[in-house]
Design a protein with these regions (language model features):
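N-terminal Rossmann-like NAD(P) cofactor-binding subdomain of oxidoreductases
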Residues: 1-205, 237, 322, 348-363
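C-terminal substrate-binding/catalytic lobe of Rossmann-fold NAD(P)-dependent oxidoreductases
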Residues: 5, 14, 28-79, 179-182, ...
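Non-catalytic surface loops within mature trypsin-like serine protease
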Residues: 91, 259-261, 338
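Secondary-structure boundary/capping motif
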Residues: 95, 162, 266, 342-343
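NAD(P)-dependent Rossmann-like dehydrogenase/reductase catalytic/cofactor-binding core
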Residues: 311-363
Length: 363
């Protein structure tokens, strides 16, 4: 098949670098253009990132020679070069909202890793295995924007991936509330230990805005499409605390869950539901989809960040330590790779879903 021509807006940051790495040899997508801030514009990609390449794998050779465009000044040029763009810029939210809408109105679909449009009512925020039906609001968004091809779709916050996928197949039992404590790697802040030495041998009990996202964004994922907008779900109620911990990659969550009276499933039922859980990403056999989305470990000391974050190329969710609790019904531990499943990898999977469903077509 002819590959889609793809651009990355915000390609020099850590998530942008992940996009560059993931698009190397992708069967559907070919990286054609990279845009960033004015200070990087005009440089070769490698010249722009050589002193801050943050990944533990080499920069793809094909990307090194690409000339970096100015994400704002070169918007018309970039939009004309590609079939769609990924967006992972570091800008104020109002500026991101305006930039993404500029590209959409230039008929360039945007698949965004940013949070700026997550609460825009006609912008789908999608985990492909959980709420692919929300893509239906794209037509209403196109009417609002006055576009034929252009639209914005976003992925959810990286913290959600370690617990929402595990809770989702249990919603049928009347999940009433959950308490979540997340332990989030420093790459979630776009940092390495070399650039953030204060995090060595440290844990910080605060990540700005993260607890609100962790409590509220699941309700949009579990919401419904109504009159061209997404109406968030009323429950389950989630309370969260979020910690920054001394790991390079991998977000872990300790999760406590309570079901409605008389609806509590057995441990065996929960494990069976996790093992059987599949979504459109698996059914469509999308290139980036894990074959088994949720993996349960019976060992009492798993999942572990170092051992399990790269399960199924970093796109699966690892679960363990499911047991009864004295205050809630059950508790368990979840783990996901925050810059793969939780960021660039999740966005690539979303783009694959959009292409497979005809929302993104080649120019």
């Amino acid at each position: 098949m002819k590959r889609y021509q793809v651009g990355i807006i915000g390609g020099t940051g850590m998530v942008g670098q992940r996009f560059v790495a993931l698009l190397e040899n992708h069967p559907w997508f070919q990286l054609t253009a990279i845009a960033a801030s004015a200070r990087s514009a005009g440089k070769s990609y490698w010249e722009a990132v050589c002193d801050r390449w943050a990944l533990d794998i080499p920069c793809p050779e094909a990307a090194k020679s690409l000339t970096v465009l100015d994400a704002e000044a070169d918007a018309v040029k970039l939009a004309g070069m590609v079939d769609f763009c990924f967006c992972a810029v570091d800008m104020p939210k109002d500026a991101i909202r305006a930039l993404e809408e500029t590209y959409a109105k230039l008929e360039c679909p945007i698949v965004s890793n940013n949070s700026a449009h997550r609460w825009t009512e006609d912008v789908p925020m999608v985990v492909p295995e959980i709420n692919a039906e929300h893509l239906a609001v794209i037509e209403a968004q196109r009417k609002r924007l006055g576009t034929k091809r252009g639209f914005i779709a976003v992925k959810s916050n990286c913290s959600l991936q370690s617990y929402v996928p595990a809770l989702h197949p249990l919603m049928k039992y009347g999940l009433e509330r959950a308490l979540v404590c997340t332990y989030q790697a420093i790459s979630g802040a776009g940092k390495t230990f070399q650039r953030w030495p204060e995090m060595v041998d440290n844990c910080i009990p605060y990540i700005g805005g993260e607890e609100e996202k962790s409590e509220q964004e699941p309700l949009k994922l579990w919401g419904r499409v109504e009159n061209g907008r997404i109406v968030k779900a009323e429950g389950p109620a989630i309370t969260a605390q979020c910690f920054r911990v001394a790991c390079q990659d991998g977000h872990m969550a300790a999760v406590f869950m309570k079901f409605k009276d008389g609806c509590k499933p057995s441990i065996e039922q929960i494990k069976a539901d996790w093992a059987a859980f599949r979504g459109p990403a698996q059914e469509l056999q999308l290139p980036s989809a894990p074959k088994q989305f949720l993996h349960y470990f019976e060992e009492p000391d798993r999942p572990q960040t170092r051992l399990d974050r790269m399960l199924e190329r970093g796109m699966a969710v690892s679960l363990g330590r499911l047991r009864e609790d004295t205050q809630y019904d059950y508790k368990f531990v979840g783990l996901s790779h925050n810059t793969l499943r939780g960021a660039a990898g999740g966005a690539v999977l979303l783009a694959e879903l959009l292409c497979a469903n005809g929302y993104i077509q080649q120019v």
